[in-house]
């Protein structure tokens, strides 16, 4: 098929006529034979013809980022409401849901970012672009640590972390989406969960002699000390890391969960009711499966156990289904704006959350901090702590709002 630019004309009603000449052997259901020259008429593509961006995705992602910022700086002096704290070990608090929800949305976003390009753009080009993003996400927290903790230098640089895990999961999920079928990804998802369960509960830990799920002696902790060395692990322990290397395997499964749900959401041959029903059903079944597996392999965010993947993935699916139904199907959009502001610049908001609270803490009013001046005198310690945390989120939102109205969307 060839395109003849000279044959392009302006049609009535502001439409555009483009004449394509097909070889005699070429046939297509899209051809409209107007004469013996086999010319076709195609209307100009307008904004209304383009696939609509699902507002619910930005809202769900934005709500997740807002919670990530809140729970990263949940209060002052240990006066923190229990739901804003991570579980001590086994179990799951609302705070423990935030990170898996974000990785779930990474998977959903891969579908929306890559589906149209998968068949038209060289996979090597897409993978190289994903690799560049991965390197940037890896470097951001390392550079940030060197800025805020210059005395530690490279000798005590924490290598694992939230952004490094996001980076690795994003890259692996992108490659799997581009290079494998959905059926193959389903098998990889199952193999990751079962394989991780076997590694953590049946294979003896070197130097310990038996498999276990304790913080300092489980297989993941041993691998982290071996690969990164204790000086490069989480500052609170130096013996294990909640975003350790082995836990990347089930974390990738969380993103694959999101890819599966995203493929349903993007399917054009199912109506909205069917999509919503499938998502609710799948979510509920996953939650039940996670709770059953919890009896043998406890739900644990730090270990990112297989039961944790199913439980949190199911809840994320239910939450996204509810958002999709209310916002994109029923049209309830009044409350969405604050979350869209965060959701359209999600990574930027999270990165800035590591800087802005630090500099806010340096601000003095009459020789006292913002917390001591505005909150501590008027609230109980735990409520003052909560209001202070919400205030930090609000300040970050104002920064992202300026980005939003200026149409500054930083894509790493």
Which positions does each model-derived feature cover?
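Alpha-helical transmembrane segments and their immediate juxtamembrane cytosolic regions
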Residues: 9, 35, 40-412
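Hydrophobic residues within membrane-embedded alpha helices
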Residues: 1-6, 17-18, 37, 94
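Aromatic (phenylalanine/tyrosine) cluster motif
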Residues: 3, 13, 19-22, 41
């Amino acid at each position: 098929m060839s395109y003849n630019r000279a044959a392009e004309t302006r049609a009535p009603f502001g439409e555009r006529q483009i004449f394509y000449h097909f070889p005699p052997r070429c046939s297509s259901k899209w051809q409209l034979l107007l004469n013996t020259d086999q010319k076709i008429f195609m209307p100009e593509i307008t904004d209304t013809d383009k696939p609509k961006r699902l507002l619910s995705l930005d809202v769900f992602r934005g709500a997740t980022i807002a919670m990530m910022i809140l729970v990263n700086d949940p209060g002052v002096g240990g006066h923190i409401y229990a739901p804003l704290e991570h579980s001590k070990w086994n179990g799951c608090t609302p705070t423990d849901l935030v990170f898996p929800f974000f990785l779930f949305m990474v998977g959903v976003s891969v579908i929306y970012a890559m589906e149209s390009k998968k068949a038209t753009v060289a996979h090597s080009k897409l993978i190289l672009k994903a690799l560049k993003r991965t390197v940037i996400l890896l470097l951001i927290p390392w550079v940030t640590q060197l800025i805020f903790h210059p005395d530690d230098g490279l000798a005590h640089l924490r290598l694992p972390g939230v952004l490094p895990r996001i980076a690795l999961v994003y890259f692996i999920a992108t490659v799997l989406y581009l290079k494998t079928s959905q059926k193959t990804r389903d098998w990889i998802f199952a193999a990751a969960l079962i394989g991780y369960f076997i590694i953590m509960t049946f294979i003896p830990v070197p130097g310990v002699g038996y498999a276990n799920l304790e913080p300092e002696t489980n297989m993941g902790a041993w691998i982290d000390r071996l690969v990164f060395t204790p000086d490069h692990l989480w500052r609170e322990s130096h013996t294990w890391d909640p975003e350790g290397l082995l836990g990347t395997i089930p974390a990738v499964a969380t993103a694959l969960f999101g890819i599966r749900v995203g493929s349903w959401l993007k399917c054009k041959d199912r109506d909205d009711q069917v999509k919503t029903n499938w998502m609710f059903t799948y979510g509920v079944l996953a939650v039940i499966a996670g709770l059953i597996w919890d009896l043998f392999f406890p739900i644990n965010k730090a270990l990112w156990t297989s039961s944790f993947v199913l439980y949190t993935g199911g809840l994320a699916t239910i939450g996204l289904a509810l958002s999709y139904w209310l916002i994109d199907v029923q049209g309830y959009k009044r409350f969405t704006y604050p979350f869209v502001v965060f959701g359209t610049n999600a990574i930027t908001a999270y990165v800035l959350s590591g800087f802005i609270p630090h500099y806010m803490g340096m601000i003095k009013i009459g020789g006292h901090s913002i917390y001591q001046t505005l909150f501590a005198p008027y609230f109980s310690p735990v409520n003052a702590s909560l209001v202070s945390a919400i205030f930090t989120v609000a300040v970050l939102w104002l920064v992202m709002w300026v980005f939003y109205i200026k149409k500054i969307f930083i894509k790493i």
